[in-house]
Amino acid sequence: MKKPFTYNIYFLFCLLLLTGARQLMAQNETDGIMMGKNLYCVGVMTARSGWDQYWEGGLLRRNENLGTVSTKMTGAMGSLGINKKLNILFSMPYIRTSASAGQLSGFRGMQDLTVFAKYLAYRKKSGKNTFSVFAIGGLSTPVQNYVKDYLPLSIGLGSRNMILRGMLDYERNHLFTTISSSLITRSNIELDRKAYYTTQMVYSDRVDMPNVIYNNIRAGFRNKEIVAEFVADNWVTQGGFDITRNNMPFPSNRMNMTRVGINGKYEPVKWKGISLTAAFFQTVNGRNMGRASHAQFGFFYILNVSGKTGGKKN
């Protein structure tokens, strides 16, 4: 008989590394900032996410067999200005999962390598107003063959992902609004078993993974020293099925989520090239997701690969 399970925080935490965790960077794929030519931003970040309630389908409930499910992450991240219109970004996290109750052991290990190309397709300045259009593309792939089918404690789902994003940014007197939308296409994955049940019995080790639509809006204040912003995310899978009552989750479940949060960055004038970042997010609505709180901190250094320290961002 299967034990009651909750849905894995991995998908909220780890796939949102495509967005949420990289929001700690001095520049990332969901903001209107570009690194200048030959500027390289590199650093480390740490994050923790946890929940003790989850949505089983649309029902918000608890699971005493797991208690609080926690995910900790330490990651290396960076971005490089190829020129003033093209930036390359990367991230690779180390994940550790755990549950405060029950007998299930968590996992730890390197998860996925993600690389983005961010292109400034159009920018128009008129007085104090600046309007920008961006096109972003990315790929992610597992860096090891980790266990996928042990939710909610797997460190990843093991799919290879392609991300296509369009983004608009408007700024006036250092106040800004940025809106973006992404399509995330996911490859099939293979399990360590030859049969599984979704809404019917499937005699195969291969699982079709639904694609995802991800939307992001952020608004706030930014200048050369400070960024302070409110962020809202919406994540909707294009298919999948609900967790059945008191049953184990499955990698291709439907996973929908809305979360809100705040994000900040500080670049001290006296510490040229240094960026300190922090963020907090709360999941406010979901389906087959943990009702998670998420906090993260980062330290980054901007250098000029031509040999100069610090530099200018667009």
Give short role names for the model-derived ranges.
Residues G36, I82-L86, A121-G127, Y170-H174, ...:
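Outer-membrane beta-barrel strand-turn architecture
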Residues Q23-W55, R123-T130, V305-N314:
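Outer-membrane beta-barrel biogenesis signature
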Residues W55-G57, R62-E64, M201-N314:
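Outer membrane beta-barrel transmembrane domains
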Residues N38, S70-T74, R108-L113, F131, ...:
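Residues that define the transmembrane beta-barrel architecture of outer-membrane proteins
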Residues R48-M73, P152-S154:
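Surface-exposed strand-loop-strand hairpins of Gram-negative outer-membrane beta-barrel proteins
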Residues T46-D52, M92-S98, A121, L139-N145, ...:
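Transmembrane beta-strands of outer-membrane beta-barrel pores
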Residues Q103-V207, S252:
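Outer-membrane pore/translocation modules
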Residues V44-T46, A76-I82, F90, V115-Y119, ...:
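Residues on the lipid-exposed face of transmembrane beta-strands in outer-membrane beta-barrel proteins
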